[in-house]
Regions:
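Extracytoplasmic/secreted proteins, especially bacterial periplasmic and envelope-associated proteins
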Residues: 21, 25-28, 72, 76, ...
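Mobile gating loops/cap/lid regions near enzyme active sites that modulate substrate access
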Residues: 48-68, 72-75, 87-90, 94-157
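Residue-level preference for long, well-ordered alpha-helices that form the structural scaffold
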Residues: 3, 15-22, 63-77
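Oxyanion-hole/transition-state-stabilizing segment in secreted/luminal serine hydrolases
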Residues: 1-20, 32-35, 39-58, 151, ...
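Residue-level signature of catalytic and energy-coupling elements of molecular machines
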Residues: 41, 81, 101, 160
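A structural motif corresponding to the C-terminal end of an alpha-helix
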Residues: 29-39, 77-97
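Extracellular glycan-modifying ectodomains
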Residues: 2-4, 82-86, 112, 158-159
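C-terminal helix/juxtamembrane-tail motif
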Residues: 155-180
Length: 180
């Protein structure tokens, strides 16, 4: 079996056709927005999902490495989405469908945290930092890190405010002009 035919997430094998279906859904959603009058629409890529703390815990092995099969799935989805948006933009008059690459910027933060002013890239700040997410990170959950701004992730999935700040300027610089 080719490595891109199936991705193992936890105990579930997911066919690549699922990722293709999602990108096709985004294509049709874009078309619906266009028909409702929208002319400038931005779509964020999938992030390097295999490098978020929860997926390092669940699929990264004992060393909690990035789960490359999940990153490959995200790259496949991003490739399909980008092509669909290009196709849509060339077929609809005055339509601007902008693919915004979050994948590579966030991956650079994760792989080179010190270059961007971070100390911790593989754990969230909340709880153990390995698996807690969203609702499990609340006022009753002890925050383990002394300085949240040292961390790229708040919980095991979502970036911190500091990480978002590090992403916003390059994202705007690379993409804002594509809307006009």
């Amino acid at each position: 079996m080719h490595k891109l035919e199936y991705f193992r997430i936890g105990y579930i094998n997911i066919s690549c056709s699922v990722f293709i279906l999602i990108s096709v859904s985004a294509f049709y959603f874009s078309k619906e927005l266009y028909e409702l009058g929208a002319r400038r629409i931005g779509f964020f890529s999938a992030p390097p999902i295999g490098c978020v703390p929860s997926q390092r815990t669940l699929a990264g092995g004992a060393g909690r490495k990035c789960a490359e099969n999940l990153n490959e799935a995200a790259k496949l989805f991003n490739s399909k989405l980008s092509k669909k948006l290009d196709s849509l933009g060339s077929s609809l008059p005055n339509g601007r469908f902008v693919y915004i690459d979050v994948y590579n910027l966030l991956l650079d933060l994760i792989q080179n945290p010190k270059k961007h002013g971070f100390q911790v890239a593989d754990k969230g700040c909340c709880g153990t930092g390995d698996i807690e997410v969203s609702i499990l990170c609340n006022q009753y959950t002890p925050v383990k890190c002394a300085n949240i701004s040292d961390h790229i992730f708040w919980d095991s999935y979502h970036p911190t405010e500091s990480a978002y700040k590090a992403l916003v300027s390059p994202l705007l610089g690379q993409n804002l002009n594509k809307f006009f």
